[in-house]
Amino acid sequence: MTITGKLKSVLLTYSFIISINLLTTMSEASAPSGNPPPPPPPPPPPIEGLNKFKSLNSPPNHQLDNSAKVEQAQHTNKNYTTSNIKTQLSQSLEVPTPTGEFGKKYSKLINPKTSKQNLKIEFPNKIISLVRDELTTKYFAADIEKILTLFSKKNDVILSEAKEK
């Protein structure tokens, strides 16, 4: 097998693991669970010292012109929207508990309590660290063999642990 062929096999294995992750999370997300969606989070409470701070920094006559009021309202809405989006993003990263046959079969490979992007994020970092640790330009072909061997051993360990559970 050529070097490019070996690298292609690593990438194919990587894409297979990602597809398993996506299939299990997508099949579980599309299955009706019977539970209604959670209610939206309440708006953040007002800060007590904020009004006092605003009164200290306002003009002496305590009146704002219309442009300042509009700008202040837009700034407040922007902050609320940003925090609301961050909250929605953090909620959407949760993985539902597997219930279908396919999900149960492969659920041991994925920790449902972590985000579904966990595998996508960690896996390339593992490959990069293996390449950094093992790859030298002098023994390129031999080092590719080491990487593939370590990679296949890691996959075997993951799959055997999943089968045991």
Swiss-Prot record:
Pro residues: compositionally biased ranges: 34-47
SUPFAM superfamilies the record matches: Formin homology 2 domain (FH2 domain)
Annotated protein name in UniProt: Uncharacterized protein RP084
Start-end of Polar residues biased regions: 54-66, 73-94
UniProt region (Disordered), positions on chain: 28-97
